[in-house]
Amino acid sequence: NTKLYKVMCYSMKNGGKRLRPIIIKEVAKSLSLNKNQFLKSMIAIELVHSYSLIHDDLPCMDDDDYRRGRLSTHKKYDEAQAILAGNSLLTMAFNLLAQDSNPSLVELLSILSGHEGLAGGQSLDVDTIEKKLNFKIIKKIHEQKTARLFEFCLAAPFIISNKSQKEINMSRKYGKIIGTVFQIIDDVHEYENKDNEYINILNVMTKDDEIEKCYRYEIEANSLREKLLPNKKNRMNDILSFIINRK
């Protein structure tokens, strides 16, 4: 029960809505997977998400003192412990996935959380602060920092179910849409609350345009859902509606 473990637990206990593991669960249930088959993927994605939030809040990154109404990990403890806690959560995620003996899951999450995904998006975010913003740059940052992990949430159950590569690719596209919508709505809320960060889509686009885009994405996502999960009862449509309409 080391100090580092306590720091890790502190960040995990401030987990918000747990939306990412919920999505894995809903898709997995629709594919008739049992809990033991997808539980580690649920935990792994939340570990990676928590690691990203710890590092995102650091002074050298977004420099946020609070996360969901509580002190950020580096403010509650210190920067060194926060960095180590984030590193430990990330490695723990891959430890869990490796136990499932499905290398495709490990491969996908490593791609989506590494330089081609989450970490790469954060690098672009930091590098863009001193540069002129445009839609293409912000879209790229949001796709990598946010949408990539949602890709894993949708694709993991299809990988576990040994579905075709075509279906896995479609599920990743579905996840990318959900993640993109999630970030657009986040940006809208930040803009309206005057908690406006530099990397915000509403700094280069209008709110009405982005909300309209979300509804177009919803139609595309529902079309993919019907192809991937035909005649399956699930809450994926409700989840996407919740993301768009959340306050």
Regions found by a protein language model. Give the residues of each.
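Mg2+-dependent prenyl diphosphate-binding active-site environment of isoprenoid biosynthetic enzymes
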Residues: 2-226, 232-244
